[in-house]
Amino acid sequence: MAQQAADKYLYVDKNFINNPLAQADCGAKKLVWVPSTKNGFEPASLKEEVGEEAIVELVENGKKVKVNKDDIQKMNPPKFSKVEDMAELTCLNEASVLHNLKERYYSGLIYTYSGLFCVVINPYKNLPIYSEEIVDMYKGKKRHEMPPHIYAITDTAYRSMMQDREDQSILCTGESGAGKTENTKKVIQYLAHVASSHKSKKDQGELERQLLQANPILEAFGNAKTVKNDNSSRFGKFIRINFDVNGYIVGANIETYLLEKSRAIRQAKEERTFHIFYYLLSGAGEHLKTDLLLEPYNKYRFLSNGHVTIPGQQDKDMFQETMEAMRIMGIPEDEQMGLLRVISGVLQLGNIVFKKERNTDQASMPDNTAAQKVSHLLGINVTDFTRGILTPRIKVGRDYVQKAQTKEQADFAIEALAKATYERMFRWLVLRINKALDKTKRQGASFIGILDIAGFEIFDLNSFEQLCINYTNEKLQQLFNHTMFILEQEEYQREGIEWNFIDFGLDLQPCIDLIEKPAGPPGILALLDEECWFPKATDKSFVEKVVQEQGTHPKFQKPKQLKDKADFCIIHYAGKVDYKADEWLMKNMDPLNDNIATLLHQSSDKFVSELWKDVDRIIGLDQVAGMSETALPGAFKTRKGMFRTVGQLYKEQLAKLMATLRNTNPNFVCCIIPNHEKKAGKLDPHLVLDQLRCNGVLEGIRICRQGFPNRVVFQEFRQRYEILTPNSIPKGFMDGKQACVLMIKALELDSNLYRIGQSKVFFRSGVLAHLEEERDLKITDVIIGFQACCRGYLARKAFAKRQQQLTAMKVLQRNCAAYLRLRNWQWWRLFTKVKPLLNSIRHEDELLAKEAELTKVREKHLAAENRLTEMETMQSQLMAEKLQLQEQLQAKTELCAEAEELRARLTAKKQELEEICHDLEARVEEEEERCQYLQAEKKKMQQNIQELEEQLEEEESARQKLQLEKVTTEAKLKKLEEDQIIMEDQNCKLAKEKKLLEDRVAEFTTDLMEEEEKSKSLAKLKNKHEAMITDLEERLRREEKQRQELEKTRRKLEGDSTDLSDQIAELQAQIAELKMQLAKKEEELQAALARVEEEAAQKNMALKKIRELETQISELQEDLESERACRNKAEKQKRDLGEELEALKTELEDTLDSTAAQQELRSKREQEVSILKKTLEDEAKTHEAQIQEMRQKHSQAVEELAEQLEQTKRVKATLEKAKQTLENERGELANEVKALLQGKGDSEHKRKKVEAQLQELQVKFSEGERVRTELADKVSKLQVELDSVTGLLNQSDSKSSKLTKDFSALESQLQDTQELLQEENRQKLSLSTKLKQMEDEKNSFREQLEEEEEEAKRNLEKQIATLHAQVTDMKKKMEDGVGCLETAEEAKRRLQKDLEGLSQRLEEKVAAYDKLEKTKTRLQQELDDLLVDLDHQRQSVSNLEKKQKKFDQLLAEEKTISAKYAEERDRAEAEAREKETKALSLARALEEAMEQKAELERLNKQFRTEMEDLMSSKDDVGKSVHELEKSNRALEQQVEEMKTQLEELEDELQATEDAKLRLEVNLQAMKAQFERDLQGRDEQSEEKKKQLVRQVREMEAELEDERKQRSIAMAARKKLEMDLKDLEAHIDTANKNREEAIKQLRKLQAQMKDCMRDVDDTRASREEILAQAKENEKKLKSMEAEMIQLQEELAAAERAKRQAQQERDELADEIANSSGKGALALEEKRRLEALIALLEEELEEEQGNTELINDRLKKANLQIDQINTDLNLERSHAQKNENARQQLERQNKELKAKLQEMESAVKSKYKASIAALEAKIAQLEEQLDNETKERQAASKQVRRAEKKLKDVLLQVEDERRNAEQFKDQADKASTRLKQLKRQLEEAEEEAQRANASRRKLQRELEDATETADAMNREVSSLKNKLRRGDMPFVVTRRIVRKGTGDCSDEEVDGKADGADAKATE
């Protein structure tokens, strides 16, 4: 069933394809493809052809449509439906390719061959075509034998690697989400199965399993969900799988490229970060969550979109799979935990929040819980970490300074740290996997590389990462195009094949140059690197430079409008991509906070410190900020000591990758995305078409069909296919090319199917596969024949054996029959009885003879035994001698071998030296010849020089004469140049018109001359006036039109400036409107106030009193508002204190034990808190009471005033008139005030918005102003140019006005051309037969056009000269002809209409020509297709003829064999019946066995589940015990932490007082130390230099002979250069840190003053803390007593342990001694062993207790640190509360005093006057209050703005000063650096020389020792030979041994040598 399901997705249904009805229907309907907006192309039947158009009937709905013939594409017959290789299509066009892919995709067939490569369409669902059965199906099969599959591509790559011994690569290309990663996994799966040294999956090797598990690990850490793809690779990888000679996998290596690390900190909408974060948070258990401090998804800031799930994937299960994969990969658990800790730490980094302090820009960390978690996870100190982030040490000059960071800088540092940590972890993981995959010792012979890189990405806005990804894909596509199209055709030309080079127009090099070109002009990456070196460079300046350098590049575009968010556009092969250059400089430099980096390098966690081991190579933030301003523009290249940017590193990586790929044989897999909705079974035709066009699929198929994709070397072709032509090549024939020609003739191949090159035979696609099939058939025939011969031989042998057996049986039968006849005959019986008796008599005689012989033999035997004993003794002696001789021989052979080796070396050296000598002699001869030649040349040159000198003298005199002429001609030349410039401009403007009229200009000129003569002779003055008027009118009108057009062009040129100016104008308009509104409102308010004041001044004293009351009331209201604000502040502080107190409560409740002392402390703190709360509540109550009293008093005063008003109303009737007038005025004022208030409210609302916008837009406004000024300059320049252009245009108008008269002649000519076009259209129908004639006509037309163009150019130049003269004449005549403008206008209109008609006709002609070109190209393609089909048909005919011949031969053979097969069939049927019965019985037995196996597996599963349950229950019990122990340890740790905390609290105040002195001393010490270090380094370098100079002088003579060691020395030099770079980087950092330290010192001095003030404040709080400290001391003493007891107990336990160990040893000795004493001893032994075990248990308990105590001590220290920080916070809060309380008390006192004064003043002064005017006060009171409040707010805002302005100005001045200081320091540092570099380079050269000489001496010494050893061996061998010559070897050895006794072998040899020497004397 599984196989059937797989076949559905692999094989095509043949019934549908071979349907005859469909074939007939296609032929009858004339089906074609027509364009469709919905489906790309849709089928239609061709009904009728009408000229250029055709009428078609759509198959889908029967609708008839008119379509242009060029848009119609042919349809393939139904038999080509769902074809596996699209190169087989008869009609190759876009519609056919798309239709074939669509049909296969909808049938589940996702793989399709496209010529030499494979096209894959993502199915977006799982298909059953990747099982092991499918792998076995494709294993070892040829490509044409199986349907298309990724396994087939992989198998062909594997087989070609094994056959050709050439490295292979499989490149998966395509957009993001097209399925590259999945296909890569399938490639690795296939190779791991096919190339495994283990046969079955159960026996699968560890390396293969690790190789398969590498992908899941990398996907978890490097893949993420994007909008386009749920498992998008956010990095590129090149997997290199190494194979040995036998084709087995011996190792692998993975290289990664450009991890998108920014995804770790932020993600786009509906996207995820890397999978591992979600896996960990979902799959981690409770224990792991507590260890890693994990939190829910929504608590992490770096997870931008929270918990985004992937459909069909469980993150929890994926976590388990990832951990299992890491286990298989061999990553230990501690490293796994290190990885998970780093991941949790990265997430926690995002939770660190910084806030800006109130008075400064400095950042602060109000809550450090996240920082504590990060520090715990990464193994670093919290305080150092926070200090490194908030106030890092930065080098300023030579000193280090602590610099306070702003909020933005701190946030950037945290994000950069998170990205760098994750990237380093990923890099470590890749190295770890490579280490695991490359551990085999077998050598790799070749490799297959699989490339899976991030696909092409086009988002709404694309950043630096997308540029790098798209740049990579551009390079890969270029490699594909170069391999498929360029290299293929170049090889054809190189091999001398007849081939016309086809340009497919797919060169992507311009786009690649735009990105990567280093200079002339520099590309985008080069410009980015260049900008990174400029300190004031910004992203905007980078964009401006890119636009300036690459603005005219064809692949580069500027954004059309400024409102577009993009900065620039690049036209890639996959489409136009908009890029936004935000933070590109930072991304390219990738800076880091080096303080935190060094802290991480010093981490207590080994894993973290290993990640940051290369901390010296990072780019610090100070390095980026303090880069030299004097960096040259070309300084972006890598130099000594300079950091390398991300772009540079990536470009180098990519260059290496491309070099690797070029050295391999590439196999391309083109992955295509069917839709953007990720839906299965849906295919967007337009999307697929775009991808096919971009990837060059059609061109690849076309070159595969037209070209010769298969090629074989001559020798290999002969070796492989000679079996097909056995007798075609004569024996001993050596010429490979001629042999191949003879073979091809014998094969009867069509000449169109092959080409023979210089070294290879080339075949069209399919031919080689056909030859392979024939070869396989031939080999099977040969093997069958061989098997038949073998079987015949064996049968004949068996027959002969049977014949021998038959003859033997016949003999036996004959003898048996004779015996049966004789046995009853009497004489036979008598013979049988008498014969033994005769033998007995003879036997006695024989016995006597034998006894005599036996005695003789015994004697001989004894003699032989004696001889044998003698011989054995002799043999033993000889064997000993033989062994000695063998040893001697072996030594001699070894010496000979060594001597031979030495001789070979010497001869090799001699040959090398001779070769060198010969080379040198040849060089010397060449040099001598050159010298002679140069001397001869020198003589000639001297003669020439003399001649030239004479000529120079003559010319000098002529030159002086010419100098005078030059001065005069220069003025003329300038004028001519100016005229020439004007003429060139005119030519540029008239170029377009000239192209249209070039072919008829000559005729126009002649007509013009005739017309001018006629006009002069006939028209006279009238015609002259009319001509002048027409010219003037035309000139005026055209001038106006051209000015309009120039205005349009100017607007286009200023497109960017208009957009900017529009935006700026809008903003300025808004600001101006708001300012105007504000000014109007303020003016209206001032006018209203002035009116009120004037009216009030005119009134009597009562109004003055009213104003005084109003001022007092406003003061009271201000006081009330200030009190309310104070109250709100106090309430906020109260809330803060309450929250802090509650937090402290919770912390104290968590940390403190339930002891009595702790409860007392807690109760005291609670009492203090309650007291504080009561005091606050009392203060609040008193405050509220005071406010209530004030309100009551105020209301009473108002009521009294109201009563007085009523009394005064009755009494003072005289004031009623004045009151009425005032009331009318008041009403008017009220209306005005209401209107003002409404307007003011609106303006206030707008003002707030504008203030918010102003801050954002001020920077933009300033930039806009700058741009506007630049554009204004450009506009002014353009205006000047326009003025000059208008003058030129006026002149050209006068010329064109005359030309328009003769345009009527063009009409007849255009009619002629139209008739020609109609004739061409008629001829177009018969183009297929007359194509060659058309090409000839076209060539002739082109030649005519070129000739006409040349003539037109000449005539135009003449005409321009005449026109210039005419223009000058006409200018003079223009002044007289102003009167006749109307007639000229009419004539002009007519001519304009004629011109438009002519231009339209010309455009129609051009369009018709374009259509003809299109039809020609289409017909050319159709002709190519027809030719290819013809080739196929010829090939098929020849194949059919061959098959027919073979079939006839086979038919004759089959007839003869059929009779034999009939007999064998009868026998086989009988045997088959017997075997069937046996098979049935075996099947039954097998079924029974399978049932038993199933039962056993079921029982096994049950037992496993029971075991797992038991283990889980056991684990739960262990976990609970572990948790209890952990809690106990935590409590003890808290106790220890409290102790240390109290000790630190006492020393805190003293530390703050001494801080200033310590800082000053440290700074002085640092300066002195730094200077000492520099002096020491200089002295050391000088000493080393002197020593090296001495060594160099001694070894100069030897260095000349060591030229061969130069390569080794160069390697050492490179290492030293790297060290030098590191040293220079250190020096740079040291200088920068020194400069920053100076700045930090100044800041610290300012801070110290503030600290001194803070110290005074803290002294007040110190007394309170001391009281708490005393209580804590009591607790500490009790805890110390407990500690002492614990320590005593520990010491006692250790003593007991030692005693127990001693007792154990003694008892063990006693047991050993008393083992033989019996039962009592055994009992004693058991008792003692039990006692030992008890003691050991007690010892282990004591050790555990000590460990617990140590843990508690550590935890107590940590807790004390936390309590210190909490206490500091409490102090600050208490101080703030105390200050707030004092302020409130002061305010209360002041308010009381003011109230009393007001009450007394109101009662005494204003009782009489208030009564009359109280009503008016009540009405105007609210209005005035509101206005005063608004004024106060406005004044406050003004003050704030002024403060901000002052701060900004101060900052600007500080920055300017700092910049000047930096410049000076940088100059000094650069000079110092240059000196150091020179010294280091000299030292390096000397060191290299010394090392080379040292190595040479070592080698010579080794050679000398070797020669000495060889000589010693030769001497010893000669001595041995001499010994053998004087006396026998055995005797001498015996003598020596007797003499030496027990001496060593060396002494024996020495003595023997001495004896030999004496003997010789």
UniProtKB/Swiss-Prot annotation:
The cellular component terms of Gene Ontology attached to this UniProt record, alphabetical and capped at eight, are: actin cytoskeleton; actin filament; actomyosin; actomyosin contractile ring; adherens junction; apical plasma membrane; brush border; cell cortex
For bias kind Basic and acidic residues, which ranges apply?
1035-1055, 1332-1344, 1949-1961
| Keyword Coiled coil part of the UniProt annotation | yes
Residues annotated as domain Myosin N-terminal SH3-like = 27-77
What SUPFAM superfamilies does its record include? Myosin rod fragments (SSF90257), P-loop containing nucleoside triphosphate hydrolases (SSF52540), Tropomyosin (SSF57997)
Phosphoserine-modified residues are 628, 1114, 1715, 1944
Q: What is the protein name given in its UniProt record?
A: Myosin-9
**Source organism:** Rattus norvegicus (Rat)
Gene coding for it: Myh9
